[in-house]
């Protein structure tokens, strides 16, 4: 079973939190708010997205790299995660 399926409830809870934070940000932009409050909300969203990314990467590394017995498949999976990390860090 894929780690994203096994951890589905936890990951969905994180995405719901992110969704709520984005909705709150949109509401903040519709009404007058201090720039600092808007920036704080954006930082909170970024932190939540980073947390989600960390959990999915951790699951991927554990399942597809550490516990992968097929060396060729492990190399393929490593290439995939490295490309994702490159695009995420840009």
UniProtKB/Swiss-Prot annotation:
Q: Where in the cell is it found?
A: Cytoplasm
Q: Which GO terms describe its molecular function?
A: DNA-binding transcription repressor activity; metal ion binding; transcription cis-regulatory region binding
- What's an example GO BP annotation here? negative regulation of DNA-templated transcription
**Encoding gene per record:** rcnR
Name the Gene3D superfamilies on file: Metal-sensitive repressor, helix protomer (1.20.58.1000)
Kindly give the Pfam families that the UniProt entry links to this protein. Trns_repr_metal
Gene Ontology cellular-component terms listed? cytoplasm; protein-DNA complex
Q: Which residues form a coiled coil?
A: none
Q: Which NCBIfam families match?
A: PRK15039.1
Q: Which family does it belong to?
A: Belongs to the FrmR/RcnR family.
Keywords for this protein: Cytoplasm, DNA-binding, Repressor, Transcription, Transcription regulation
The free-text function statement in the UniProt record for this protein reads: Repressor of rcnA expression. Acts by binding specifically to the rcnA promoter in the absence of nickel and cobalt. In the presence of one of these metals, it has a weaker affinity for rcnA promoter.
- InterPro entries associated with the record: Metal_Tscrpt_repr, Metal_Tscrpt_repr_sf
Q: What is this protein called?
A: Transcriptional repressor RcnR
């Amino acid at each position: 079973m894929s780690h994203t399926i096994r951890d589905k409830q936890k990951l969905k809870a994180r995405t719901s939190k992110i969704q709520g934070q984005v909705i709150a940000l949109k509401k903040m932009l519709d009404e007058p708010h201090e720039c600092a409050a808007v920036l704080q909300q954006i930082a909170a969203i970024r932190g939540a997205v980073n947390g989600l990314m960390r959990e999915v990467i951790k699951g991927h590394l554990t399942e597809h790299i550490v516990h992968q017995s097929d060396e060729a498949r492990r190399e393929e999976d490593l290439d995939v995660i490295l490309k994702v990390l490159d695009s995420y860090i840009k």
